[in-house]
Amino acid sequence: MDLKTEFTFDLQNEEFETIRQGIRAYNAQHLPDGEVKKIGCFVRNEEGNLVGGLTGDLFTNSVFVEFLWLDEHYRQHGLGSQLMQRLEHEVKPQGVTVICLDTYSFQALDFYLKLGFEQVGQYSDYPAKGINKYFLQKVI
């Protein structure tokens, strides 16, 4: 077998898609059947403008919260907690038993810990020196 290893700083879409589809096909052999559902929970002001919310993926018994954001004028008013509580309330009847997420050291680790999340992992000095990335989960 005559194989050649390559490296690039300019990844092309064709190579990316080949790798992505390959790992997805492999994963599908080991994961239960089911569709990943995109979910969201939002906060709107009096004018109906979106001022915050969360987005994530629901798959079988789990939710991964990808993003939680509030406009800076609406922070420190309990809205983040309300969003997370609403998420739990809505997904638990769907059979969800665990919520997972990640956060950086400059974001909201203490917030999630106060909500009952448990830190289950950490990258140090990622994505830059002096910044950590934390992985959390909460069994509901």
Positions of PLM-derived features:
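Conserved catalytic-core motifs of GNAT/GCN5-like acyltransferases
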Residues: C100-D102, E118-F135
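Conserved acetyl-CoA-binding loop-helix of GNAT-fold acetyltransferases
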Residues: Q76-H89, K114
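Short loop/turn motifs at secondary-structure junctions
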Residues: F64, G95-T97, G116
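Acetyl-CoA-dependent GNAT
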Residues: L3-E66, D71, F106, Y123-D125, ...
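A generic structural signal for beta-strand entry/edge sites
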Residues: T60-S62, V98, K133
